[in-house]
Amino acid sequence: MRKAFALLVIVASLSLFIPSAFPAYDSAAVKAAMEKLPQHMTDIQTKSAARDYYGAAEGFMEVARLIKKLDVIVPVKGEKAIWDQNHRNLINAAFKGIGACGAQNDAAIKEAIKELIKYRNESHKIFK
């Protein structure tokens, strides 16, 4: 009986602690990020087309920063593990874009942009 009571106390304590371990879903932050993302993507495309590789690299870094800020959020819809993996994929695609800018490789920049769009679309299918 004591074991059952102790287990009940532990479960009750954890149920109070675990929800506070992650921030609540911040729809305003997610919405603001999703409004900024297309702006950054347009900026990257414009700057890379003008062969402003430094400016395009800054745009890719802004995308990585934007997505990284959303890492702590627990999605209302979908699994947190998938949310985290998708964010890692988006950030890695942005880093590939930065590397492509450093190499002044227009084809690789376009591929990085396609990859960002792919992961953004996948994320929207799951979490939107």
What are these regions (language model features)?
Residues 1-9:
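Bacterial N-terminal signal peptides that target proteins for export
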Residues 8-17:
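Bacterial N-terminal signal peptides
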Residues 55-57, 63, 109-110:
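Solenoid-repeat scaffolds in large eukaryotic assemblies
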Residues 66-84:
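Short, solvent-exposed, charged loop/turn and helix-capping segments
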Residues 22-57:
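Immediate post-signal-peptide N-terminus of mature secreted/exported proteins
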Residues 96-128:
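C-terminal amphipathic alpha-helix
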Residues 35-38, 42, 61-64, 68, ...:
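Generic structural signal for well-ordered, non-transmembrane alpha-helical segments
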Residues 43-50, 72-76, 96-103:
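General structural signal for alpha-helix termini and helix-helix connectors
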